[in-house]
A protein has these predicted regions:
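The alpha/beta-hydrolase serine catalytic core
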Residues: 8, 18, 115, 121-158
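Hydrophobic beta-strand anchors of alpha/beta hydrolase catalytic cores
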Residues: 34-36, 63
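Alpha/beta-hydrolase fold nucleophile elbow
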Residues: 99-111
Length: 158
């Protein structure tokens, strides 16, 4: 017996429509609402995103997992987003949930998604809990992962 339900959840992000899935607990009220940010180039269907979201839903939490711009079924160009663009999309996800009456107080980020969640949390005062799973914590590691050049980032601001 499944004690959760799964629904498609689309919303507007920094580069167009973003495709998501929301895992909802079968019972009301929810114990909390979370947004899950996936790892670099992984997507909402990754094993980590799927398992964490479903497990939390079965424990009473509503969890939105979505594809960043340019990945999966989401619009946009993946190579044009950057860390701050992904953070913008997390903020958009939280705002879209609020429009549905779901107040997000938890951000969860896996790997690169953890870095994006940290960046987004600074703009979301309603977020009370920030969870990272294997998130990079050194700037050089993040830059190596995304193949970025410090001078280019400083000049472009992204």
């Amino acid at each position: 017996m499944t004690v959760r339900k799964t629904e498609r959840f689309a919303f507007t992000g920094s580069q167009g429509d973003l495709a998501g899935i929301i895992e909802l607990p079968a019972t009301q009220p929810h114990r909390g609402v979370a947004v899950f940010a996936h790892c670099f180039a992984c997507g909402r269907q990754s094993i980590a995103a799927t398992r964490v979201a479903r497990d939390l839903a079965e424990r009473g939490f509503a969890v939105l997992r979505f594809d960043f711009a340019g990945l999966g079924e989401s619009e946009g160009e993946f190579g044009q987003t950057g860390l701050l663009g992904n953070a913008d999309d997390i903020v958009s996800a939280v705002e879209a949930l609020a429009q549905r009456g779901l107040q997000c107080s938890i951000l969860i980020g896996h790997s690169y998604g953890g870095a994006a969640a940290i960046a987004a949390a600074t703009r979301l005062p309603q977020v009370e809990h920030l969870v990272t799973i294997g998130a990079p914590f050194e700037v050089d590691h993040v830059l190596d992962t995304i193949g970025a050049d410090r001078a280019e980032l400083a000049g472009a601001g992204r």
